[in-house]
């Protein structure tokens, strides 16, 4: 009998991607986050679709429509908080996925890595626009502050800002277009994720020791399907705990106040997952310089393959580089904390030092340390 799974044009693609895919036998739980990101994206698209059925993208009714979803729609509160906290889980998985890539040298798969960086930008853009939709105080002022950063671009800056706003301030036109973009982007992300996977399967997965695993492969199913299901259950457990016990833990209380252009909140800050980049932006006194540093803080990921000077791919057997990697992680946690603090002493200087350390570690210290470790191999 012909095995339909291996011959049917559609099922063949699924089979070669998720069933008969040869996978390294030693990949750890750090390799689970790709599938978890897929689950997060599905959760976000489904909950977002149901929210869009009841949401109105008009400045007069947006805030009320979100309240209506929470109070009057069947399980509307659940859908809304799953969507809001699902975004946080998405970013936790994203940061861990990128961190895994940095630690184990997965960035040496250039196409996969660069599409991943593109995906990160797309997810960040989607999350930013989604935060504007409830039309609370932080939505309005966050949109105003972040879009205003484009005015730092010489010559065309102010025209560009007004073009994005669709007027002379963040208003009805801005909200409507942000809703449209927020709706379409997840589908673009899904398509990009497919391309990301396509390029990954051209080379096969990396593994913790960073050497070729061609000599020792196992089928993806059942070994890694079971492993991914375990990760998925843990993800859903954490997400549901967050949603059912403290749904507003990661949100901002200011967003429960309807948007008011005449009243500025005491501290304008984005969602927690943008705070590290926001801290880098704020630590530079010059507007254009701050914007460039903000963009570079993420775009620096694209040049990491060029900074790889080590003879070994992963950090598994490089203790000095491991120390620097964990210092970088601690630095990012510090930046996240600083981003949520008011602009006053001592937070300003801590933010500036943490920002300098961030770029210094990635651009100078880590490549030099890799060269040092190459020499240590000769001893």
Curated annotation (Swiss-Prot):
Q: Where does a ubiquinone bind?
A: 201
Q: Which GO terms describe its cellular component?
A: mitochondrial inner membrane; respiratory chain complex III
Binding sites annotated in the UniProt record for heme b b562 = 83, 182
Disulphide bonds in the chain: none
Instruction: Indicate where this protein resides in the cell.
Output: Mitochondrion inner membrane
Q: Does the keyword Protein transport apply?
A: no
Q: Which Pfam families match?
A: Cytochrom_B_C (PF00032), Cytochrome_B (PF00033)
Top-rank lineage group of the source organism? Eukaryota
Q: Which family does it belong to?
A: Belongs to the cytochrome b family.
Q: What is this protein called?
A: Cytochrome b
**Source organism of this protein record:** Chimarrogale himalayica
> What's the gene?
MT-CYB
